[in-house]
Swiss-Prot record:
Residues 334-355, 428-458 form a coiled coil. InterPro entries: Atg17 (IPR007240), ATG17-like_dom (IPR045326). The keyword Lipid metabolism does not apply. GO terms for molecular function: molecular adaptor activity; protein kinase activator activity. Signal peptide: none annotated. Keywords: Autophagy, Coiled coil, Cytoplasm, Membrane. It is found in: Cytoplasm; Preautophagosomal structure membrane. This is Autophagy-related protein 17. GO terms for biological process: autophagosome assembly; autophagy of mitochondrion; piecemeal microautophagy of the nucleus. It is a peripheral membrane protein. Residues 205-227 have a biased composition (Low complexity).
Length: 557
């Protein structure tokens, strides 16, 4: 249809030769020209597509600009979110390690504490089971166990202190667990937001990959931005080409109007056909000239005179262009359809970027809220647990030492009682040996005494009458007699200083002990004993003690 420009541009010239009769017969009739004018007028409805193309380009350009901004913001947020998420999970891991380490250490300490307490309780139970032999206690006293000589208030106070430490540690552990559970809930919420983000990104990627113009975006979590400028450029080219096509349709319409007006009887018909044309939208802009002004100018312009040859050439061009006008209209329609499809892809990518940005903002808001309000509390709770555990761990360690000391002390008490029984048996044996020595000595002394008495009596009978009584006054005296004296032993050297501040024994106690530091026995054979009392223990009791001592020695070696 470009040939219409050259034909319609000739405003007049020298008249050509008269047309032949054949040419006059082949010239189209007015009805034919009017039908071409009506068709040309109808083709001008494509101006709506041109206006729409202009809107599409404007919308696509705005969408591209918005997409660039949103994509940049999303990329910036994603980089920040990745760093924050790594930091957040590092904090959660460290807090969990504090909890697990504290729980493990606490469990180990409790195990040691239970073992130490079990040993102490076994020792106390042995004290309860060990009955003091009646020979060590006053006559008539109710049987007593070794446990009766133990003051358990220290054990109870130690248990109470340990229980307080355990309760405080358990409380701190429970608070840390509660804090960690809340932390996990926060992470779960963030995971849900991240899941929504991934779902949106996956959906956007699938939509982007389904577009022929953005096939490279199928493996990306964000729609491809590289395809959008080319789309916009393609839209601009389509719009410009549509404007050019519309201009050709306008020129064809102008040519039809001019041809009808120059045809006899066509002026009124042209006015009737074009009288109702109103172009209410200004289509001027980057994509073409002001079409409204051009149409109105052509409709109202005065007719220029044409020669017959010019008229014939104009009609020839008109008929030729009329065959192409429908193709031009179809091309405009096809181009606007392709532009609509491209715009749909551009808007879909923009909407996908918006969705991803909104999902990213949602995750960022979760992280920001967590970091600014609750995360410091979770970290502080871990520090509080560490502080409490260190304090109570030291106290429990001291309690373990105290339990071990008490257990050792009570074990020593049991061992000392066994040693006391052995000591009593030893003293009893020594006493028996002393008594034997005394009996043997008494027997020999009695023999010597009798021999001496008999010898003196024989001497007196034989020589006494011849000796004056004053020659040796002792000559008639009986031999001396030997009496043994038992002396109550004093305190053992080491026990003297320990008992220095003890109260003095009462008179009854002194009488029970023998009446004083010394005790004279009337005779060796006197059975009345007023010195130290050594209990007489059953042989099987002593043997049991020996067996326990041997077992204890084996267990320690």
């Amino acid at each position: 249809m470009s040939s219409s420009e050259s034909s319609s541009a000739s405003g007049g010239g020298p008249p050509d030769a008269e047309p032949s009769q054949t040419e006059q017969q082949t010239m189209p009739q007015l009805d034919t020209l009017i039908s071409h004018l009506v068709a040309a007028k109808r083709s001008l409805s494509s101006i709506n597509h041109v206006w729409r193309a202009n809107e599409i380009v404007t919308t696509a350009r705005a969408a591209l600009e918005e997409s660039v901004v949103v994509s940049a913001r999303t990329g910036f947020l994603r980089r920040g979110l990745n760093n924050q998420l790594r930091l957040l999970y590092s904090v959660r891991t460290e807090v969990e390690e504090i909890s697990l380490r504290g729980r493990s250490e606490f469990a180990a300490v409790l195990k040691d504490l239970d073992a130490a307490d079990a040993r102490l309780r076994r020792t106390l139970e042995l004290l309860r089971e060990t009955i003091v032999h009646g020979g060590f206690r006053p006559e008539g006293e109710q049987p007593r166990s070794l446990h009766d000589f133990v003051d358990e208030r220290g054990v109870e106070e130690l248990h109470a202190a340990l229980k307080n430490s355990i309760d405080r540690t358990n409380g701190a552990q429970a608070q840390l667990d509660s804090s960690n559970h809340a932390f996990d809930d926060e992470l779960l919420s963030i995971k849900e937001a991240l899941g929504n983000y991934r779902a949106v990104a996956k959906l956007a990627s699938s939509r982007s990959s389904s577009s022929p113009s953005s096939s490279s975006a199928s493996n990306s979590s964000l729609p491809s931005m590289s395809s959008m400028p080319s789309m916009l450029h393609s839209l601009e080219m389509h719009a410009q080409e549509m404007a050019n096509l519309l201009e050709s349709l306008v020129r064809h319409f102008d040519l039809c109007v001019t041809a009808v007006k120059h045809t006899e009887g066509g002026g009124a018909a042209a006015k009737s056909i074009t009288g109702d044309m109103h172009v209410g939208v200004n289509a001027s802009g980057r994509i073409g000239p002001n079409i409204e002004e051009g149409i109105n100018a052509n409709l109202n312009a005065p007719l220029d005179p044409l020669s017959d040859s010019e008229y014939r050439e104009m009609v020839h061009v008109l008929i030729k262009d009329a065959t192409e006008a429908e193709d031009v209209v179809m091309e405009i329609h096809d181009r606007i359809g392709e532009m609509e499809s491209s715009l749909e892809n551009v808007l879909a990518q923009r909407d996908a970027l918006r969705s991803i940005y909104n999902a990213t903002i949602d995750v960022f808001q979760h992280l920001s809220s967590l970091a600014s309000t609750r995360l410091p509390g979770y970290i502080a709770q871990a520090h509080d647990f560490t502080r409490v555990w260190h304090e109570e761990n030291d106290r429990i360690a001291g309690g373990l030492d105290d339990l071990a000391h008490l257990n050792s002390f009570y074990d020593g008490f049991l061992d000392a009682y066994d040693g006391l029984i052995i000591e009593v048996a030893r003293r009893r044996h020594v006493r028996q040996r002393v008594e034997k020595v005394l009996r043997d000595a008494k027997h020999k002394l009695d023999q010597l005494y009798e021999e001496d008495v008999n010898a003196r009596e024989a001497f007196r009978v034989e020589k006494g009458d011849y000796l004056p009584s004053d020659i040796w006054p002792e000559v008639g005296r009986e031999p001396m007699r030997i009496e043994f004296r038992r002396i109550l032993g004093g305190k053992v050297k080491g026990a003297v200083s320990e008992q220095a501040n003890d109260e003095e024994p009462t008179a009854g106690e002194r009488e029970q002990r023998g009446g004083g530091q010394e005790n004279h026995l009337s005779a060796v054979g006197d059975n009345t004993e007023v010195d130290e009392v050594i209990p007489e223990l059953p042989r099987d009791l002593v043997e049991q003690v020996f067996a326990r001592i041997q077992t204890r020695v084996k267990s320690t070696t």
